């Protein structure tokens, strides 16, 4: 049982082409953290569309799908705007078939719906992050998720930098392989890092320096130039002694930013 990203050479990990899914229930972790308008209409479905090759391959192979994802960063247990129920209609349209929905990702309802799935059927679970155990990579929570299926597929490249229960914990309990999107992204990164064209420039953005420490430290040794963008650029500006006013800044990470600048 092995996860695609945690440990070892990613190029040697199994993909969905390496397993037989006929008649099996497959837990599929995807990244459907898509934007919505005020009426909760999806304004950009790119992340959903990019998973279709994986989902259709599994369905054509005779699998039943249990799809898991998160939306946003819920600060309360059940904020409606973060519910995956807002994805059901569009996902059904993309797949051309009915999509069942569970109002929780674990527990009696999810277990009953998952157990009753037949080959070719699809179940979408409620937001994983409604449970704090997801981000904590809680073993008991991961085991509950894994118990819904026979095998798991990780196609959520967008969250692969996080060791959460659904992507890092589940593989400890059931066999987990990479989906086509995950495989494509990892192969692209490996190819780029192994034999890059020069000059090699990396553009890294986001709000938090703390989320990118490992990436930046690793990239410093491989690239010619790193361009820092997004909110975390202000933390680096502060580290260089530049005025940033009231701009977003991780004050407790300024010393760390200084260390990274010195390393560069």
Residue locations for each model-derived region?
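Active-site loop-to-helix "anion-binding N-cap" substructures in soluble metabolic enzymes
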Residues: 11-264
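Short, Lys/Arg-enriched N-terminal segments with co-localized hydrophobic residues
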Residues: 1-10
């Amino acid at each position: 049982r092995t996860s695609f990203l945690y440990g070892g050479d990613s190029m040697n990990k199994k993909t969905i082409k390496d397993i037989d899914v006929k008649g099996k229930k497959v837990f599929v972790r995807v990244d459907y953290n898509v934007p919505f308008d005020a009426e909760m209409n999806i304004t950009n479905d790119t992340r959903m569309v990019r998973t279709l090759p994986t989902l259709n391959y599994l369905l054509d192979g005779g699998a039943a799908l249990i799809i898991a994802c998160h939306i946003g960063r819920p600060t309360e247990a059940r904020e409606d705007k973060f519910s995956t129920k807002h994805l059901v209609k569009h996902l059904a349209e993309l797949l051309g078939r009915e999509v069942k929905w569970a109002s929780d990702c674990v527990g009696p309802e999810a277990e009953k719906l998952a157990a009753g799935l037949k080959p070719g059927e699809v179940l979408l679970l409620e937001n994983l992050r409604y449970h704090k155990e997801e981000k904590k990579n809680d073993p008991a929570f991961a085991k509950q998720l894994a118990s819904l299926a026979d095998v798991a597929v990780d196609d959520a490249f967008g969250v692969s930098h996080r060791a959460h229960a659904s992507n890092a914990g589940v593989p400890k309990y059931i066999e987990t392989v990479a989906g086509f999107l995950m495989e494509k992204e990892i192969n692209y990164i490996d190819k780029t890092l192994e034999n890059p064209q020069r000059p090699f420039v990396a553009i890294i953005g986001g709000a938090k320096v703390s989320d990118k420490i490992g990436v930046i430290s690793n990239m410093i040794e491989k690239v010619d130039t790193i361009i820092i963008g997004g909110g975390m650029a202000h933390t680096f500006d502060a580290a260089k002694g530049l005025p940033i006013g009231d701009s977003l800044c991780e004050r407790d990470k300024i010393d760390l930013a200084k260390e990274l600048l010195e390393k560069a």
